[in-house]
Amino acid sequence: MKTTIAEVNQYVGQEVTIGAWLANKRSSGKIAFLQLRDGTGFIQGVVEKANVSEEVFQRAKTLTQETSLYVTGTVRVDERSPFGYELSVTNIQVINEAVDYPITPKEHGVEFLMDHRHLWLRSRRQHAIMKIRNELIRATYEFFNERGFVKVDAPILTGSAPEGTTELFHTKYFDEDAYLSQSGQLYMEAAAMALGKVFSFGPTFRAEKSKTRRHLIEFWMIEPEMAFYEFEDNLRLQEEYVSYLVQSVLSRCQLELGRLGRDVTKLELVKPPFPRLTYDEAIKLLHDKGFTDIEWGDDFGAPHETAIAESFDKPVFITHYPTSLKPFYMQPDPNRPDVVLCADLIAPEGYGEIIGGSERIHDYELLKQRLEEHHLPLEAYEWYLDLRKYGSVPHSGFGLGLERTVAWICGVEHVRETIPFPRLLNRLYP
């Protein structure tokens, strides 16, 4: 019976065949222990000299790391194993022998591992991170589908910059200038006027010359946009969504969290409501903590976000930023036009901003004024202005950065481990 490691619990006491790679091995006299992986999980294969032919036993002792195999054996319960089962091996068939696999069980430097990212993905740690990333994506689709959202795909090539910045990757679109997308938000606003509640999930590109542990050049964003949602509606949805993601990982990825050594007691606290600070209150909190390098009107850096997060055991909203700090499309607070109806959600434990969101301007004249204040060409945004001319309504949305969210939930220090093939300031390979 051919099966996978994830399904061996269905075949206890039965003989099965698994296609796998040899992650590691050790031998002791008349017994060999094979650490096998097949993508669905890890299992130990036990080869006892008394139970196999001499040829099979010698083959087991000489197998090299990452050799691909068909391994046949009887499934046994093993309470000592994190997985709960082991394979009592009866036969081994080599598919392809791996010679001089570069990533040995010893410690390796980060640059070496990044040069071999295509192989580093095979490790237990990276396997766990990718499985948790996948669970966040699965849970995202489940969350929004259950709430009546429609998945809409935004273009990667655009003729304008949603944030109105210069941090763009430029390319030629035949005879026109084009840019790699920084966000699908503007297109989601158009889609929300047609479909009510929508979300996009795709790659975004920022030509930021940042080398911090929080920054990637290419990263993935989940961007919902909702017609008839005002500021408070938006915050409640964000709380619900982030809590849903965390609880899904806690319930479905226990093995992976354990493999990463993640303290799940901190994640168990992530349930609505989340604490809130206005920008004004956040500035005061930082001053009270002794920060002298920030005043009203300044944006927060990583040390500031970390200091704010340390005051709470859940993600915290920072709301009502100065209008001057935020993009042109954010709705000013009607009671105080110098701030906008926006919020950044700061993750605990120093992982920084994972969500940025706001209520959007829905008045044509105000949006046009804001575009002019930001010195953006009106002709490039004519279609976006049209949304305010033809049945505009209050609407809101947000963007969640997948990689920072993965880093926080997994408890990994750097976002380079949270995406299969990271694109960094100094890295475009492999």
UniProtKB/Swiss-Prot annotation:
Gene3D superfamilies: Bira Bifunctional Protein, Domain 2, Nucleic acid-binding proteins
Highest taxon in the source lineage: Bacteria
Keywords on record: Aminoacyl-tRNA synthetase, ATP-binding, Cytoplasm, Ligase, Nucleotide-binding, Protein biosynthesis
Catalytic reaction equation(s): tRNA(Asn) + L-asparagine + ATP = L-asparaginyl-tRNA(Asn) + AMP + diphosphate + H(+)
Subcellular location: Cytoplasm
GO molecular function, one term: asparagine-tRNA ligase activity
GO cellular component: cytoplasm
E.C. designation(s): 6.1.1.22
UniProt similarity note: Belongs to the class-II aminoacyl-tRNA synthetase family.
Complexes and interactors: Homodimer.
PANTHER family linked to this entry: ASPARAGINE--TRNA LIGASE, MITOCHONDRIAL-RELATED, ASPARTYL/LYSYL-TRNA SYNTHETASE
Name of this protein: Asparagine--tRNA ligase
Source organism of this protein record: Geobacillus thermodenitrificans (strain NG80-2)
